[in-house]
UniProtKB/Swiss-Prot annotation:
This is Peptidyl-prolyl cis-trans isomerase H. One of its GO terms (molecular function) is peptidyl-prolyl cis-trans isomerase activity. It catalyses: [protein]-peptidylproline (omega=180) = [protein]-peptidylproline (omega=0). Its EC number is 5.2.1.8. Its main location: nucleus.
Amino acid sequence: MEDIHSGPATNTNPIVFFDIALGGVPLGRIKMELFADVTPRTAENFRRFCTGESKNSQGKPQGYKNSKFHRVIKDFMIQGGDFVNGDGTGSCTIYGTPKFADENFVLKHDRAGVLSMANSGPNTNGCQFFITTTATPFLNGKHVVFGQVVDGMDIVRMIENTRTIRDKPSQDVIITQCGEM
């Protein structure tokens, strides 16, 4: 069965962006379509962390701006979104809980550029996400796909090919700006 979102972006789903810097040097922009039509809760969680609409307990904006891609594995994926601890251990949601349930597994990890939730097991979605750099069908049914890269796959490839030590980038890969288009 063909993925219902294997083509260009729709007119109704939100488009968000990350501006990326590597070691303080701007690399460019990644634009992503969020599949709000298939995974509305997951897409909205990510969208609000992109726009800064989400507030922490002190009423301050929280989200992906100035956070890192903390895990990079060539020929697999790039992972980020831990603005809580910055190292892959933090979790936060817009729903007032540290984690939320898997919404569905309708969409598949069938190509590079798939945007999916990182987790630590069933129903442990938070703020962390990853972008695939190849098809990863072994993740189907385990991680919720909620978007796709629509522009800037060259930037994803630059991140994928950055030098790492034990899957951690040697230089900081920072989301310097983010928001909704």
